[in-house]
């Protein structure tokens, strides 16, 4: 059975400022760096063998800290990027107009084709996240990979493994540097394929960020 660990990046400047990041970027805060060091300590205990990260700066920095603790190289995979939030990227969430807020909500309230102008849909996000996860099945036997990605992206992945549609209303909170785990199993008695073992574990963190943006 393959175990794959999923880690969201540490808190960023724009998380703290309540700005929409998407595939735009901002650096980790001092708190985010500390969170990354704490999740790195846990990752070392887990015996991680491979680290695969989104190629955005905030995930790369988080992955670098984890890799240093685990003694692993980092493979960058753009399929693990955050949802493309189109024209709303860099905007403060409290400054959105009613029309813009409706665009944002359509992504996650059951609207299959909802998307922000110049952005991508949750279905498109789900397809590339599942493709990245499936690549882990090609790793050598005995591997224990860790993927570093983003709040909406990981929430979409975990939710769809549980059988929810990609565009379902978001009811899964994955805080900065939380750890989730999904397992791939083949069984005559249990569900075959990917199953969720853990979601959003923050027991390794001193003070989880109260981040409502989840990205």
Curated annotation (Swiss-Prot):
GO cellular component: cytoplasm
GO BP annotations listed: glycolytic process
GO molecular function, one term: phosphoglycerate mutase activity
Binding site for substrate: 8-15, 21-22, 58, 60, 82-85, 104-105, 151-152
Superkingdom: Bacteria
Cross-referenced Pfam families: His_Phos_1
Major enzyme class: isomerase
Transmembrane segments: none
Keyword field: Glycolysis, Isomerase
Enzyme Commission identifier(s): 5.4.2.-
Name recorded for this polypeptide: Probable phosphoglycerate mutase GpmB
Originating species: Escherichia fergusonii (strain ATCC 35469 / DSM 13698 / CCUG 18766 / IAM 14443 / JCM 21226 / LMG 7866 / NBRC 102419 / NCTC 12128 / CDC 0568-73)
